[in-house]
């Protein structure tokens, strides 16, 4: 009860927001997104509000939707709102506002204002605590940013399981990567649901943003895929259940997401999830259909492409090809479904989707009200959308639907015709025919039924099946519905008077055609049909009804079977009837039918042609009955004069000579009739057959007859067929088709677009094809063909069809080239005038398009160009008054435009003209150059008037000129009059425009002109380079690069040649050019700089110009790294003599710049000019850049290669130039000694210059320079040598020999020079030489060593030379080894003296101190045997002194002492330590520790034999060290060691002793141990209790380590100490400060001794009995909390280990008996004290029992019976802590035994 209440109270406290808990409030207030905790904690809400409100106001400017929060969470009132004071309803209302704000601000969290605004929500409303889920999800899309890390740091520690994934990242303060989030969404249902819930909510609020929606889509898609993968099972039913569960969780999210069409990214994300589900799970067909419908209904223009891909994936998973109707209709409603499906199929396999569309198109054929679906179906097959396999499947679907169409009722004639055409397309197409044949062959389609249903013939179908198969099929056929009889009956009462060709819309005709189509295939039905009153067959010879009906059918767009049947009906009638009339009215329709694609149709038409021909042959002239239907063929309203009829005799000639000879070819080839008519009407024969040409009159009569029919026939299907035939003939019998068919063009023009579309659609004639044939009636033979065509669209009428206008202009383009040039000029002028009309009509656009598309003559282009200057002149009146322009400050006053429309018109006119010129291959019209330059001048003039750049116009004019100039360059001479060239205008284009295109074109033009007419260009060229430097060179596109290259290649050589011709200095003459390029350096893209400058220098001449470019770059950019790299690249391409000559000129320029009256440097570097820099600074920059070039160029390798070549004078040139450069450098240094910066820079050059020499050459040069009297130069030279040696100098044999020989020069300097700095430099060089080359010949180094060790070097008073000398000796010791011995005496004596000097009080010298120790380190390593005992003593004593001084670094000293311990003979080391131990102790703890480390290292690094040999001295040292505690305590207040120092040193001593023990055997060590025991126990007088206590403490601390380290090996040694330990236990106490350390050491040594007993030592009663009672009695020391803690921590582990070691029930009983005494305050009824009087003692005893129970378990609990009474008593103990602990013990016992103690305790 009590504990439960306590838990509840603690939970309430944890969740409490007590306002009096100020610390908690401060912590909460300091949690911030943007401020450090300390800063945040110091801010008040006014300050925070001001900062955050500023961000909020900026947000409002970005998005006005934030303004609503200004009245709520960002109001002034919000500063005093405290959530803890608000009730639940208010908090809920606040949460809603906060979540709305967070949703809106989520997309802007990477912006600073948004973070500031959210900071207010954190600080004031603590959203991270109260709205944790919404806050985390708002920030989660940015989980990789520092902002999210800031949020993690302030989130509560107890995150809900939803976000448990964030806990490890919160603790380690790192951003969570994406993978764990995906894993969490996959495995953590609450997280998955929360993410979806948040995304849908935010999207509904129209606050969805890219970061969230892409994050959500990616995470959810991957997690759903992961869920489905992990749900897989070997048992299908279980896997299905698992998948269904997942899908049921996801589908509501998809429904909500797909419903929000306007949130495009959310919808696309839902598509991704749908795809994942489809690919990972096996879905029911209904589920797939539902998903597909949801997708199709959700897409918008923005998401449709993704939606189609999703549909394609879903469709692939369907078992069949059917699509839901909604999906099918949605796809058909798309703006351009075929293109979109094509894009979809590129992204994903879409075969099932496409076949589903095919199936949808042919579904319910009888119910389709229009042909939209079938039109779409045809387009699908024509668009190559389907692959080969899908094509076969699609064809099979179409054929199956066609085969079964009769079962669902008759389909419409249009549908029948559509399908028939499609099937014919399958059989006729080259690409589709093989697939179609294969499909038909592999399937069991009823071909006969298909042909019957479609009224067509499948020409490429395989042979019919065997007779018996057909019979079987027939037997199985269902009884079909007979639709013919009702249709016939409905027509019985109908009648029609007139021709069925008279008009398009005849109601009875449509009914007749349907009935006729139903009757095909049964002769009796056709006979019945033919006798209908509406056909009036009885009067067929006189009235037109009968024949005109069938003519209209066979010449219309009907199925092949229907048309063939109609032809048969006509043929049958003509064969059986007695006709005495001229049937030429049928001829145009028969001729059209002979061009039909179907062979069956052509065959029947050929038959009719034969019949008509034979009738005419029999007549031998005009028919007695006249021409059949002469007045009624096209209706009563058509006057006979409108139709031109051919006389019978002439027609007979046409039949005999032209038409009938080719009957067989007509059937075979549908194009043959066209060729026959073309040849006949032109007056030539088709072949060399017997047919002869017709006379002109006959041809004219026949041609006009056909043309009149084409014009007047009201039906457009035959009209189109006739036009296709007639448009092959341009001219016949003296007339043209333009003349004969012109009225057709006019009548079509008068028809508006919709009307034209309607009339064509009625007969299924393509409008575009009809318009194309109509405009083809205008031939180029017509002189004014362009004018005729233009007259049909100009003036423009809004009723004109855009496609007709397009066809007219298309025809213009086709005939243009065949029109005479004078007519082209006239037409071009007309078209141009119309093009400039201010209208957006198709007429204007068409005229422009024609002019742009056709090839305009040069004269026309010139005429156009002349319009520009004249028009600009006319515009002068629009500008400001001339006086205003003259007095204007800039001379460019903006125009005061009176008529802006006129200005716009002018600009458009100029643009159009220049575009025409540009697109007309101006290079082929060089005569345009004059006009173009005039245009350029006009444009410049006009540009200054209107203050407009007119970049596009300029680029057009320049581009055309450039094309002309480039052609002239190719040919080699100008193709135009060069006097018209205006170079100033071209240069002006470069200078005054900001357009890169204009600049590039102008530069290329200048380059081209400089080749063909240099004398006219070069005087204007320099401003170009000035401008290039500031503008053009910075461009980085490939074209601009090419322009710059060409300009340099072509202009620069011409410029240089011009300067030379004028005998001017080329360098100074081109300084402006060079300055332009150097000034442009920083603007030039980095990767192009080197190539550009290299090209420039190459064209200018490397020998003459490289130094100038280098100096100008160095002057302008100083030590800019990029510039230096460029300069290095430029010199690397030159050979060694050129490079050196360049440097010599460069140094000459430096010298010139420092003169009182500079020369060329004034021109190149601006020295002495008003805006020039100080000469001194210029010189420094140039010299430092030169030093860089020497160091980083390839000059050294070039010189080496040159010297390797013996022949030629190049080596001599190099030596001469090098000497010259050296002299120039030294001269600058000598002359400028008063200018320190110049002197230093010249020194750098000298150093770098020497770096280019080989080592041998370098030394030769140095040796000469060292003979000069200038000490500064000599020091500089030696420093250069040292620097060279510090790098990686040459190691070849000549170099080594020369370097060692050079030592004598250096030794001489050390011996003789009074200049300490020079000596220092010489010793530094000796040091380097000895280090690098000394081992090759040590004998040459010995003299140097002696000199360095002598008085003249380290014996000097100057510390610099001393330090350098000592370091040099250290290097020599390493290199020379024993060869160093001759110099050793001086070295040792002087170095020890120097070490002593460095340690003198007040004169400490750390550098000298470290140098000496470096020397001794080297000596200890290489010459340890030469260090005497006295030297070792001095080293140790001085080291102790060094250790006492904190100013010295200990590293060098300790390293030397370690090396002494390792390398010097062990006996010498131990002896020195023994002799100087007292000095070490006097020096203090640091020295003592270092001394012990020397002993430790010596023992460790030397062999066992050495330790055994030196055992007496080692033991002596250790005994001295062990006695340190006693000695220091004896000194009292004079002690130099703190107790902590003593403890630390004793730890070291113990480690050293253990190391020593490892190197000894038992027989060797045991005497030492007994001696140590005696030393500790009896070594001091009994009166000296303090001394005895100190030695015991030290000894016992050693024993603690001894038993703990050596463990079971030394357990037996405990027998030596038992008695003494018992004695100590009786005296020592943890409560006594003097004995506490001893007591602790005793407890710990006993624990270690017990713990590692493996020899049953402590099981022995003799050992156990002695120690048990004294040890357990230590529990009695637990009398108050402090001692109780010590006893529990130290004594109990020892007692426990003893019990473990005792390992027997008897021993345990003995221990427990003693132990239980301390569990009772008295021994029973006697009332005698038992030992447990103090509750702390009883508690300690209880803790012991607990420890023993835990360690020994049931072994110890075997003693439980005797413990039970004690337990019962203790459970009633008066001390609460005792009672608490005994209950713990009882619980522990019960856990071990597995049963309750309640019964035992009652």
From Swiss-Prot:
Protein's name according to its UniProt entry: U3 small nucleolar RNA-associated protein 10
Gene: utp10
Organism listed in the record: Aspergillus oryzae (strain ATCC 42149 / RIB 40)
Pfam families the record matches: BP28CT, HEAT_HEATR1, U3snoRNP10
Main location: nucleus
Role: Involved in nucleolar processing of pre-18S ribosomal RNA. Involved in ribosome biosynthesis.
Family statement: Belongs to the HEATR1/UTP10 family.
TM segment ranges: 946-966, 1002-1022
Keywords: Membrane, Nucleus, Repeat, Ribonucleoprotein, Ribosome biogenesis, rRNA processing, Transmembrane, Transmembrane helix
Complex and partners: Component of the ribosomal small subunit (SSU) processome.
The keyword RNA-binding appears for this protein: no
GO MF: snoRNA binding
Family matches, as SMART domains: BP28CT
GO annotation terms (biological process): maturation of SSU-rRNA from tricistronic rRNA transcript (SSU-rRNA, 5.8S rRNA, LSU-rRNA); positive regulation of transcription by RNA polymerase I
Keyword check for Transmembrane helix: yes
InterPro entries (alphabetical): ARM-like, ARM-type_fold, BP28_C_dom, HEAT_type_2, HEAT_Utp10/HEAT1, U3snoRNP10_N, UTP10
Membrane topology (UniProt): Multi-pass membrane protein
Subcellular location: Nucleus, Nucleolus; Membrane
HEAT repeats: 581-618, 1046-1083, 1253-1290, 1297-1335, 1758-1795
Annotated coiled-coil segments of the chain: none
Domain of life: Eukaryota
PROSITE patterns for the chain: HEAT_REPEAT (PS50077)
GO cellular component: 90S preribosome; membrane; small-subunit processome; t-UTP complex
